[in-house]
């Protein structure tokens, strides 16, 4: 007996030249709105984030097949009711045997194209932000991009990969009909209804400039879409920037804490990672915590403190619905890691010979 979801998906995919369009139907998964009761106990700045990987989806024969299969994986991921879902770099074309000219597959950045439209409809249906990494074109240039789609299916922001590989930049070397233009160094962090987020792509992680820019722009979550997994360098930058990192790659997916420690990862049979994170959270060197006993004595289980010995980092987060961490920092004169580093740099500059 054929799977009903496969039949529905086939009908869904046949409507355009790409094989995608129409409506997302036949899914057996709950939408976020259907399961909203499960979110009522969330703290004010708690957010569920999820990332999928491409393992077992490549190589693939056609873009239509790839998009079909990634949508099924996304439907699995939305069972955890994410506020934000991240897809891998160039998920619709990466390791797909069907070769098409770049001008044909690149999407418009202002008006949703064939692929972006499908992902936008998915985002709207499931009431979640989605990072949609695709080729884009703008003013005669091609970019390796990540498009942030909001809960209503609108394009909320576009990021251009700052550091393409040399083969990406050379016309006809990697893609038919053109090479990639490197993105600008100064790109924004994007506002969402839960906080500021930023995006990086693959080879970008080998340079500090993108990470430094997002730190200055106040990104609390960095979405790393990639072909290669990134490895421990992602953990380093999560700790260095005191931000959460969610990685969605060709081989794995991970959620990384602001301390630099892994919180979740995709597994052999579950090809997405998810975690409910608290954005009302700071990191500070463990040796600065002399006032912590007083903090615990006053607020008890309304705060959560965890020491990460390997990095000598301690994280503090609010667990109370009306208790703001910014107020606790002022009350107990807690120096966050970022404040400690910036004030130390000021002292160094002032006293250096």
Question: What are the language-model segments listed below?
Answer:
Residues 29-68, 287-291:
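C-terminal segment of N-terminal export signals and the immediately downstream linker at the start
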Residues 63-152, 228-229, 240:
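Cys-nucleophile CN-hydrolase/nitrilase-fold catalytic domain and related Cys-dependent amidase chemistry
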Residues 46-59, 195-204, 223:
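Active-site-proximal beta-strand elements of phosphoester/diester hydrolases
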Residues 111-129, 196, 205-305:
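CN hydrolase (nitrilase-like) catalytic-core segments centered on the catalytic cysteine
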Residues 281-353:
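A short C-terminal boundary segment appended to hydrolase-like catalytic domains
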Residues 138-217, 232, 236, 240, ...:
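Active-site catalytic loop in hydrolytic enzyme cores
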Residues 55-57, 91-93, 136-139, 165, ...:
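Solvent-exposed loop/turn segments at secondary-structure junctions
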Residues 2-5, 11-32:
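N-terminal export signals
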